[in-house]
Design a protein with these regions (language model features):
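Low-complexity, glycine/alanine/valine/leucine- and proline-rich hydrophobic stretches
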Residues: 76-158
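Solvent-exposed, charged amphipathic helical/linker segments at domain boundaries
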Residues: 2-84
Length: 158
């Protein structure tokens, strides 16, 4: 059983195709800050420069808060979604709580419209963002110590 589990984990790691060497904390924080600013202020040119061509975006609302139902794949799909979100951020700006690392990935915690707590983690390969992970599921965010995340309707995220 132990051997099968090790083999299963190895296959999962290979299929994930994650970068072999993690980004430095300093570089990760710089990229996370640049991504936050570009995505919140609708700077699509800067956002394009930060994203890898094959970037993917995943969101988890746990069925309790709005989130994209399917992953986005490719730079054009991710940019299109972030252009939509930038218009929403202009009406209801995100409140940045802090930058941090989550499971080794740089990112940030925000409070979105409807008092929804959101964690965004960025997988970085070289100097480009290869994957965006957005966690909005309140059950999985309780450990952040930000009180009770809101469950009211908010906007969908990428």
């Amino acid at each position: 059983a132990t051997c099968r589990k090790l083999a299963s984990r190895a296959r999962t790691h290979i299929q994930a195709a994650r970068p072999r060497f993690p980004v430095s904390r300093e570089q990760g924080q710089e990229i996370a800050a640049a991504f936050f600013a570009a995505s919140r202020f609708g700077d699509m040119e800067r956002l394009r420069a930060l994203l890898a061509e094959g970037v993917t975006a995943h969101a988890d609302g746990g069925g309790k808060v709005p989130a994209s139902l399917h992953p986005l794949a490719g730079i054009d799909a991710v940019l299109e979604r972030h252009a939509q979100l930038a218009a929403e951020f202009a009406r209801a700006p995100s409140k940045l709580v802090r930058y941090a690392f989550f499971d080794g990935l740089p990112g940030f915690v925000t409070i979105e419209a409807g008092e929804i707590v959101q964690l965004t983690a960025l997988e970085i390969d070289g100097d480009k963002i290869s994957a965006i992970y957005v966690m909005r599921n309140p059950d999985k965010l309780r450990h952040l110590g930000l009180g009770s995340p809101g469950n009211r309707a908010g906007r969908r995220q990428a």
